[in-house]
C-alpha cells in the first residue's frame, strides 16, 4: 500500500524529489495554516498564469482565472481561510495526504510538467463529505537554482472524460 507521506522519488532523483516536496507536503502544510509565506518562494512571478478547468473536460469551458500570481495568491488565501473555519471529524492533514497523488513528473531540460491528482475527500463533523476529486497540471521551471511553479491548469476532472 502506498504511504502518502513518503516521497516516491529517491533523493538521488534530486529534481523530482524537490518538486514533490514543494507540491505535496509544503503546499498542504501551507494551506492548512493559511500561510502563504511558506510557499511564496515556490513561484516564478513574472509570466505566471493559472487556468481554472472548472472540473470540465472541454477546454472551451476553462477560464483564465489567475492572470497574475497576486490573483492566485488572493484566491488561495481566501480558500485556505475558509477551509480553516470548517469542522472535520478526521485529521485533515492525513486525509489530504491520502487523497493526493503525485507520481508523474516529466522533465525536459529546465522545464517540468507535473501531474497532481486528488481522489477522495474529508468527512465533516456533521457527517457530510467534502469531495476532493480533480487534478492539476503544474508547469515548473528551474529558476534561480531551484524548481518553481510558473503556471498551472487546475481543477480538471479526475479522471478526464
Task: Name what the model sees in each region.
Residues 1-57, 61-66:
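Short, low-complexity N-terminal intrinsically disordered segments enriched in polar/charged residues
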Residues 2-4, 113-115, 125-126, 130-161:
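Short beta-strand edge/turn micro-motifs at domain boundaries
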Residues 41-108:
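A solvent-exposed, acidic/Ser-Thr-rich amphipathic alpha-helical stretch
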Residues 49-53, 113-120:
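Short, well-ordered beta-strand segments in beta-rich or mixed alpha/beta enzyme
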Residues 84-87, 118-122:
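Short Pro/Gly-enriched beta-strand edge/turn motifs at strand-loop
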Residues 106, 121, 139-141:
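Generic structural detector for well-ordered beta-strands
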Amino acid at each position: 500500500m502506498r504511504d502518502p507521506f513518503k516521497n516516491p522519488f529517491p533523493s538521488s532523483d534530486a529534481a523530482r524529489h524537490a518538486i514533490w516536496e514543494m507540491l505535496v507536503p509544503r503546499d498542504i502544510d501551507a494551506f492548512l495554516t493559511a500561510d502563504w509565506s511558506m510557499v511564496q518562494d515556490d513561484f516564478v512571478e513574472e509570466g505566471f498564469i493559472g487556468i481554472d478547468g472548472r472540473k470540465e473536460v472541454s477546454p472551451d469551458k476553462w477560464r483564465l482565472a489567475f492572470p497574475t500570481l497576486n490573483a492566485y495568491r488572493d484566491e488561495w488565501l481566501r480558500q485556505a481561510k475558509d477551509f480553516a473555519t470548517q469542522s472535520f471529524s478526521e485529521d485533515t492533514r492525513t486525509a489530504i495526504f491520502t487523497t493526493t497523488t503525485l507520481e508523474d513528473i516529466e522533465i525536459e531540460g529546465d522545464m517540468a510538467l507535473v501531474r497532481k491528482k486528488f481522489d477522495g475527500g474529508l468527512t465533516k463533523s456533521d457527517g457530510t463529505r467534502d469531495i476532493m476529486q480533480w487534478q492539476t497540471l503544474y508547469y515548473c521551471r528551474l529558476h534561480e537554482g531551484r524548481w518553481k511553479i510558473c503556471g498551472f491548469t487546475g481543477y480538471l476532472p479526475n479522471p478526464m472524460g
